[in-house]
């Protein structure tokens, strides 16, 4: 018994592109309350989102028979998830130095504005993702999955 792969684009379903719905929703809610003043803080939350993803099927392991999973490569979720991941990486836009020299007032103001802009972008992307998940987009259950990738059983002998 296995999935009947008939097209190379079906291999994507076996990758680590699935998340449990409740942990994903909880992560969105938790992330909305986080502070993003340093790159380390942004990296931590980005890693928490990345850690939610796993592979749930293999060519010979069937999709779970109960519940749904979030498919982050879905047409609705993928652009939101990718934009969220990109919004966490602001290294090239926010200069964080540990030098003892005192920055000028304008340098401080510019850096503060960039941090604030990054925080707004992150929160905005999280809110968009949470909204789509709350509206039921991006989920897949076994029946929906197997409509795309049929499960074949061994012929009776």
Swiss-Prot record:
Alphabetical keyword list: Acetylation, Capsid protein, Helical capsid protein, Virion
Residues bearing the modification N-acetylserine: 2
Transmembrane segments: none
Keyword Acetylation in annotation: yes
Gene Ontology cellular-component annotations: helical viral capsid
SUPFAM superfamilies per UniProt: TMV-like viral coat proteins
GO molecular function, one term: structural molecule activity
Record localization: Virion
Biological role: Capsid protein self-assembles to form rod-shaped virions about 18 nm in diameter with a central canal enclosing the viral genomic RNA.
Family classification: Belongs to the virgaviridae capsid protein family.
Protein name, UniProt field: Capsid protein
Gene name of the record: CP
